[in-house]
C-alpha cells in the first residue's frame, strides 16, 4: 500500500514538472518603448504553486480493498437419520392347526396283540433265564462234588465216624475242589458254595433220619488232618428254598469259604 502511494506521488510530481516546463513563452513584440508595458515576472516557484492550486490533484481512487474471502459455507450438516422405520408388523398369531384326524379304530385294534406279544416274550426270557440258572446250578453241584466229599470227610473225622477216607483220597478230593472253585467265575462262586452247603445238609439229614441209632463210633487221631477244623451241626429242620443260608448253616458255609480261599 505504501509503495503504491509513493509511486502515485512521484507520478504527480513528474506531471507537474512537465507542465511547468511547457509554459508558453510570450511572443516578443517590436520594441516600442512607448507601447511596452512593464511585465511583472512571476517567479517560477509561485507559478508552480499557482498551477498547483489551479489543478487540484485528482482524487486518488481508493485502493481497492481486497475482497474478503468468501466465507466458507459451513459443512453441510449431516442430515439426521431418517426416523426409525415403523415397527414390523406384529406377527399374526398362529392359527391353531386343526388336529390330525384320529386314527380309525381299525388301526388301534392290532396294538393289543403287540402288548401281549411283549409280555409273552418277557415271560419266555424269564423262563429261559431260570432254566439256565438251574442248568448252571446242576453243573456247579457236579463240579463241587469233591468239595462236598471233603467237607463230609472233615465232619466224619471230627465226629469220629466210620466213613473216613484215606489220606491220599482226601488230598485228591481237596485238590479237585480247589481246582473247580478256581474255575468257577467269581459271580457264581457264592451260589455254588450255597448249593454245596445245602447238599451236605440234606445228605446228613437223610442219613440221620434213616439210621438214627446205627452210628458206629470210630476215633482217629486228628493231627493227621490239620484242615479238619470246625464242626458240622446238621439241623433237624428242613432247609428253606435253595439260595438262602439259615443261621445254623453258617459254620458249614464258613468251612467251604475257607477251602475256597486256600
Swiss-Prot record:
GO molecular function terms listed in the Swiss-Prot or TrEMBL record: nutrient reservoir activity
Free-text description of this protein's post-translational modifications in UniProt: Substrate of transglutaminase.
Biased composition (Low complexity): 105-120
Biased composition (Pro residues): 56-71, 93-104
Polar residues bias spans: 232-251
Keyword field: Allergen, Repeat, Seed storage protein, Signal, Storage protein
Pfam families: Gliadin (PF13016)
Signal peptide: 1-20
UniProt-annotated stretches for the region Disordered: 51-73, 87-120, 225-251
Recorded family membership: Belongs to the gliadin/glutenin family.
Function in brief: Gliadin is the major seed storage protein in wheat.
Other known facts: The alpha/beta-gliadins can be divided into 5 homology classes. Sequence divergence between the classes is due to single base substitutions and to duplications or deletions within or near direct repeats. There are more than a 100 copies of the gene for alpha/beta-gliadin per haploid genome.
UniProt name for this protein: Alpha/beta-gliadin A-I
Organism this protein belongs to: Triticum aestivum
Amino acid at each position: 500500500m505504501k509503495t503504491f502511494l509513493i509511486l502515485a506521488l512521484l507520478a504527480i510530481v513528474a506531471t507537474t514538472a512537465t507542465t511547468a516546463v511547457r509554459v508558453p513563452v510570450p511572443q516578443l513584440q517590436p520594441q516600442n518603448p512607448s507601447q511596452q508595458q512593464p511585465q511583472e515576472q512571476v517567479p517560477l516557484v509561485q507559478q508552480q504553486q499557482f498551477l498547483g492550486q489551479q489543478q487540484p490533484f485528482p482524487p486518488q481512487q481508493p485502493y481497492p480493498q481486497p475482497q474478503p474471502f468468501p466465507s466458507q459455507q459451513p459443512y453441510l450438516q449431516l442430515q439426521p437419520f431418517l426416523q426409525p422405520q415403523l415397527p414390523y408388523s406384529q406377527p399374526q398369531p398362529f392359527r391353531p392347526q386343526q388336529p390330525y384326524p384320529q386314527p380309525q379304530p381299525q388301526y388301534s385294534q392290532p396294538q393289543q396283540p403287540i402288548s401281549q406279544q411283549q409280555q409273552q416274550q418277557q415271560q419266555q426270557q424269564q423262563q429261559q433265564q431260570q432254566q439256565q440258572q438251574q442248568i448252571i446250578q446242576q453243573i456247579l453241584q457236579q463240579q463241587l462234588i469233591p468239595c462236598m466229599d471233603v467237607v463230609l470227610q472233615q465232619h466224619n473225622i471230627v465226629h469220629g465216624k466210620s466213613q473216613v477216607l484215606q489220606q491220599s483220597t482226601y488230598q485228591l478230593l481237596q485238590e479237585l475242589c480247589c481246582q473247580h472253585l478256581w474255575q468257577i467265575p467269581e459271580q457264581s462262586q457264592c451260589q455254588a458254595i450255597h448249593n454245596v452247603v445245602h447238599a451236605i445238609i440234606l445228605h446228613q439229614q437223610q442219613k440221620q433220619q434213616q439210621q438214627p441209632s446205627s452210628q458206629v463210633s470210630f476215633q482217629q487221631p486228628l493231627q493227621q488232618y490239620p484242615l479238619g477244623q470246625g464242626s458240622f451241626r446238621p439241623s433237624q429242620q428242613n432247609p428253606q428254598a435253595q439260595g438262602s443260608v439259615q443261621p445254623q448253616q453258617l459254620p458249614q458255609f464258613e468251612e467251604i469259604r475257607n477251602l475256597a480261599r486256600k
